[in-house]
Amino acid sequence: MFNKENRQKARVKRHLRVRNKISGTAARPRLAVYRSEKNIYAQIIDDVARITLVSASTLDKEFAEKVGSNKEAAKAVGTMVAKRALEKGIEEVVFDRGGYVYHGRVKELADAAREAGLKF
């Protein structure tokens, strides 16, 4: 009943519902999170111009020693995406959890980004 395909479809439906309410602008871009089994990704996106301003993931060269998709890796990705955003002058974002429950790796990434200086 709740196999992987159905869970994925439900997540995509949740994400579409969230995306109808959330949109990133140049003043307040969107911090989008994607979680896979082996990695975690974060992007800061300007939806009006349709460009990715900043991105970070566990596949980056800086995370060679923190390979994986655990909470520690999510925390490192959150810190890195916030650091890169602040370097580009982005201080305030809208958080897009990507249809995932705000718990575990997604929450760790968000908390680390907040601690590093992003406001949302």
From Swiss-Prot:
GO terms for biological process: translation. Coiled coil: none annotated. InterPro entries: Ribosomal_uL18_bac-type, Ribosomal_uL18_bac/euk. It comes from the Bacteria. Keywords: Ribonucleoprotein, Ribosomal protein, RNA-binding, rRNA-binding. One of its GO terms (molecular function) is 5S rRNA binding. Belongs to the universal ribosomal protein uL18 family. Part of the 50S ribosomal subunit; part of the 5S rRNA/L5/L18/L25 subcomplex. Contacts the 5S and 23S rRNAs. This is one of the proteins that bind and probably mediate the attachment of the 5S RNA into the large ribosomal subunit, where it forms part of the central protuberance. This is Large ribosomal subunit protein uL18.
